């Protein structure tokens, strides 16, 4: 581990020198590339330096304790110093092991989220709306930007499906765990008998793909335009500004009608199409290797039930890690940190097991 950390520190110092080179400063591509690499190494290198400093202080204190030429008072001070430093050294070492775990190459990317009402009709569509609000509020808490891409509204104010983009550093690293089926248990407002109904909505979280990762030949894409519509199907725009893209080789279809400009809708739809194709390529690659990461939380299957939201008991349960929280209202208000942090820790523990 420490050999690897030493190599990373050398590379970090090399990058510092390169970023001070006028030739690099005048080349925007190299400057961006080296700055990004340096930023990725920053936390690990700074923690490694802190570890070396603390570890050295511990060794010096130990040496003083073992030095019989020193008086008892000095050796007692050295012992106290050791007792203070030992847990700090162990904690820093544990943190460094986590920082060296394999990184998901998509973790720093923006995401495209698709929420669909599944089993449960109108109630499932309303729940899809609740999930959309939950994710937008969570994004606000992270200072991320949310852009609505496409929405298929129901008359009661829910969504048959809604697609939106979240722009923010590390968005995929936190939201990737939301892939799967979400179940709700509650008494519908239209239910006079007070019976609890169970409905589901599915969530797909796709990392935004760059053009260099997925190149789409526009000859393979059919572009249709139509009039955008809002809740209840009413027209909200008299111009043909909404765009539907059909990728002929894969059969994937993407719509976008949120913007008033046809050009902007087409750009947004292309982002979704590129993300879906990237996701499809990744899935096919995983199947070919027949090795979806054992370290992943659950199977990542979008049909897998990952979480239950129980309204009568104000309870949220994540079935993958057996976590139950008695604060449903706060979770739906975007307070997802406790759940996401627990899922990240669980994934790290699995990766540590695989590395041993």
From Swiss-Prot:
Post-translational modification summary for this protein: Methylated by PrmC. Methylation increases the termination efficiency of RF1.
Entry annotated with the keyword Flavoprotein: no
Modified residues (N5-methylglutamine): 234
Entry GO CC: cytoplasm
Subcellular localization, as worded in the UniProt entry: Cytoplasm
Keywords tagged on the record: Cytoplasm, Methylation, Protein biosynthesis
InterPro entries: PCRF (IPR005139), Pep_chain_release_fac_I (IPR000352), Pep_chain_release_fac_I_sf (IPR045853), Prokaryotic/Mito_RF (IPR050057), RF-1 (IPR004373)
Domain of life: Bacteria
Keyword Ribonucleoprotein: no
GO molecular-function term, one example from the UniProt record: translation release factor activity, codon specific
Role, per record: Peptide chain release factor 1 directs the termination of translation in response to the peptide chain termination codons UAG and UAA.
PANTHER family tied to this protein: LD18447P
Family: Belongs to the prokaryotic/mitochondrial release factor family.
Protein name: Peptide chain release factor 1
Native source organism of the sequence: Exiguobacterium sp. (strain ATCC BAA-1283 / AT1b)
Origin organism lineage: Bacteria, Bacillati, Bacillota, Bacilli, Bacillales
């Amino acid at each position: 581990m420490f050999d690897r950390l030493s190599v990373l520190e050398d590379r970090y110092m090399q990058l510092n020198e390169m970023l001070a080179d006028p030739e690099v400063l005048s080349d925007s591509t190299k400057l961006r590339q080296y700055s990004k690499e340096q930023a990725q190494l920053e936390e690990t290198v700074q923690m490694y330096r802190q570890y070396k400093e603390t570890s050295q202080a511990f060794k010096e204190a130990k040496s003083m304790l073992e030095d019989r030429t020193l008086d008892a008072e000095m050796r007692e001070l050295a012992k106290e110093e050791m007792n203070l430093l030992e847990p700090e050294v162990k904690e820093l070492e544990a943190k460094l092991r986590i920082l060296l775990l394999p990184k998901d190459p998509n973790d720093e990317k923006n995401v495209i989220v698709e929420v669909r009402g599944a089993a449960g009709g109108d109630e499932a569509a309303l729940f899809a709306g609740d999930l959309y609000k939950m994710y937008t509020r969570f994004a606000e808490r992270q200072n991320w930007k949310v852009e609505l891409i496409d929405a298929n509204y129901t008359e009661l104010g829910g969504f048959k499906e809604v697609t939106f983009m979240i722009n923010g550093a590390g968005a995929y690293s936190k939201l990737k765990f939301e892939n799967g089926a979400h179940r709700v248990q509650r008494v519908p407002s239209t239910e006079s008998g007070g019976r609890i109904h169970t409905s589901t909505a599915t969530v797909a979280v796709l990392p935004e793909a760059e053009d260099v990762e997925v190149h789409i030949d526009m000859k393979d894409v059919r572009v249709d335009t139509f009039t955008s519509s809002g809740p209840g199907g009413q027209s909200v725009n008299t111009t043909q500004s909404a765009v539907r893209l059909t990728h002929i080789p894969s059969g994937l279809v993407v719509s976008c009608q949120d913007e008033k400009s046809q050009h902007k809708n087409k750009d947004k739809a292309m982002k979704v199409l590129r993300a879906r194709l990237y996701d499809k390529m990744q899935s096919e690659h995983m199947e070919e290797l027949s090795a979806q990461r054992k370290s992943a939380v659950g199977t990542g299957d979008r049909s897998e039930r990952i979480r239950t939201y129980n309204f009568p008991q104000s309870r949220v349960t994540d079935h993958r890690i057996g976590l139950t929280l008695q604060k449903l209202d706060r979770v739906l208000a975007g307070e997802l940190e406790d759940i996401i942090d627990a899922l990240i820790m669980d994934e790290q523990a699995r990766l540590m097991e695989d590395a041993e």
